[in-house]
Amino acid sequence: MLTRNDLKGPWAGLPVAWDENLGFDEKAYRTDLERACKTGVPGVYTAGTTGEFYAMELDEWKQIARVTVEVCRNHGTPVMIGITSTYTLGAQRRAAYAAELGADAVQVALPFWMEMDDREINGFFEDVVGSCPGLALTIYETMRARKALTLEQHRAVFEVTGCYYAVKSNSNTIGCTPEGCRQLSEFVNVWVGEELWSSLGPCGAIGCASALVYANPRVILHMSDLLQQQSWEELKPWTDMLGRLNEEGLKPFTEKGYTDSAYDHLQGLATGFLSMNPRSRGTYLSATDADVRQLRAWMAANIPEFLEL
């Protein structure tokens, strides 16, 4: 089993490669996944938001999970599989399959169709980890799941599961606040976006479920080294650069209505690291080849170092 110490730094959450008919493009996905593994990332995961778990059937999820574990195993890269579902049994079935494949960890958000009652929280996580003994658990905490856990709820999950080692903290959750990050970091690793590493790193943030390490692994792995070394002054210009990318570079695409998967295809393709098709599945909007050219031009004019792979 992975330990808490293994769940640090930027774990690469690659987009899914779809072909022109929106079927899984296994060849393109393998190519990009192998390239990510060869960079020395601390781990890889799939079936989060960028991995479009919400836009595929169970048999497709199984195929993508199988390929991900196979490629990562071949390269000696730790691998985590997202198992989020709208119901407990769905998460359990995915957890059991991840264990069967030989994954190292699972990542799960709360079931999100109806907000969970506080009394259901511990039982849900106990059921999930009971289906994948020996695997580490990370929580994907997002307000898209309609509920944010309290510090006490995080601690209770830690105690009842015995394998909860990291939380992916997003906006409006406790891990994205300085005090909440400090308190959570006492017993689990807190992952936040790389642009927050210089501000929340001193509060204990130690890693990321990364959509940028496969845009420029050289830059993001260097930033991760600075994070582990607690070199806050050296880290700050890099996080400022990523803040500018988010606020300025991606602004035209935010105005178009793009969301996670479109952004993350777009950034990885704009730098030239990814080779897959920019398309993602509906309902949500896809990036286009023209968008890729537009973002690359902005990067060249404003953050040229991010194009240096």
Question: What are the language-model segments listed below?
Answer:
Residues 131-133, 142-251:
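Catalytic alpha/beta core domains of metabolic enzymes, predominantly
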Residues 6, 11-15, 39, 219-309:
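C-terminal alpha-helical cap/extension of soluble enzyme domains
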Residues 64, 124, 157, 235-238, ...:
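A structural signal for short hydrophobic/aromatic patches embedded in well-ordered alpha helices
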Residues 67, 127, 156, 179, ...:
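Alpha-helical scaffold segments in soluble metabolic enzymes
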Residues 2-148:
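Active-site beta->alpha loop and helix N-cap motifs at the rims of alpha/beta catalytic domains
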Residues 29, 61, 65, 91, ...:
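A general structural signal for well-ordered alpha-helical segments in protein cores
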